[in-house]
Amino acid sequence: MVDVGSLSKGMYIKYEGEIYRVIDVNKHFRARGSGLIRTKLKNMSTGLVREVNFNSGEKVEEAEITFRKASYIYNDGEKYYFMDNETFEQYGIPVSDIEEEKNYLVENTEVDLIMHDGKPIGIQLPTSVVLEVVETEPGFKGDTVSGGGKPAVLETGLKITVPFFVEKGQKVRVDTRTGEYIERA
């Protein structure tokens, strides 16, 4: 059991018989009273996000999950398929379970499969991935003064802002937590 005051973003808990990932935590403390912990929880089996309020001092069960190294191999429109790097077993995860992560997946991307009771319930991406720019406007000399950027579409369909010197066909490193450009790869 874990005290709700120690909940943090990214943790997995068991609440009302279901496995949830903590998406957001806000702690509010009232004068002379107990605190209120407001959370956003994503149900790992349905993908639905719900807001749950806890009083400080309450306890929740931490979910028993394990991580397995795997590689993304392909998708068939309904599921994304991953191969376990040790056993070579293939796992299919529905698109709805990895809605946010799918924009960073290209063939052979190394991920951690999040497992519960021997079944995959989601994936954890590396902190950054390298993706190819497939569409962007040409840069102009002198635009570097503003320090801004220009829109670009990457090979997975992800839209980000890149510096003016990045051109179509180049590979860029993208932070998977924020979706922002890091550097040219």
Curated annotation (Swiss-Prot):
One of its GO terms (biological process) is peptide biosynthetic process. It is found in: Cytoplasm. CDD domains: S1_EF-P_repeat_1, S1_EF-P_repeat_2. Keywords: Cytoplasm, Elongation factor, Protein biosynthesis. Pfam families: EFP, EFP_N, Elong-fact-P_C. It comes from the Bacteria. SMART domains: EFP, Elong-fact-P_C. GO terms for cellular component: cytoplasm. Pathway: Protein biosynthesis; polypeptide chain elongation. One of its GO terms (molecular function) is translation elongation factor activity. Belongs to the elongation factor P family. Involved in peptide bond synthesis. Stimulates efficient translation and peptide-bond synthesis on native or reconstituted 70S ribosomes in vitro. Probably functions indirectly by altering the affinity of the ribosome for aminoacyl-tRNA, thus increasing their reactivity as acceptors for peptidyl transferase. HAMAP family: EF_P. NCBIfam families: efp (TIGR00038), PRK00529.1 (NF001810). This is Elongation factor P. It comes from Thermosipho africanus (strain TCF52B).
